[in-house]
């Protein structure tokens, strides 16, 4: 799927569907490559675009398809989706036809309109074999920008040419890369956390988690999930046969609250928060 804001003055996205980008292909032949490139061809000359890479979760955010039926939880999720939608809008407006991004490459005898912007879904792009995908990106794009964080199940596109801004591997967006336990130890703050290595067989829930109603469970290569304490032991023993597992508390009496902070930060709010934490 390709969403393009490149042509004319219209701001409406134009969706192009192609079997070459939505299905897997193992062919290394030129016809397949030509079809792939043609599906992403540019309408005006050969001006390269900026590609914004996203995964299928972005569609769910914009459609609000994952809202909880519980009113209190649904309101928090709706606020989260709204903030992410605003961040996407601001990112799109900044990247699309931004003259400041092409100052060094602009020709003095040619008008500077900035680069057009395309939204590329990672699942479709990764359906191409690596060689074909690399040729498509090099032919059509001057810069790749990844949505962050991408879902852990999706391996994002990594590229040196064109330059890529964003997480190069899924582990960059994972709890393991962020090293939560180390940060909690240094700052002296954070929820009770326990990292269990693969193959561990706990016979009972550790005492530190006995008083909590729900726990946040994160295993390697998967997004975290909230599990009731009453049946977490069975799930833990099953997950530990495949990977290491990080256990964190998520609600002392009821459902815990997770705060999602969209980037970029608002400078005024950032200064207020810094003052608040510094004075507390």
Curated annotation (Swiss-Prot):
Belongs to the FAM91 family. It comes from Homo sapiens (Human). It holds the Pfam family FAM91_C. This is Putative uncharacterized protein encoded by LINC00869. InterPro entries: FAM91, FAM91_C_dom. It comes from the Eukaryota. Residues 16-29 have a biased composition (Polar residues). PANTHER family: FAMILY WITH SEQUENCE SIMILARITY 91 MEMBER A1, PROTEIN FAM91A1. Residues 1-36 are annotated as: Disordered.
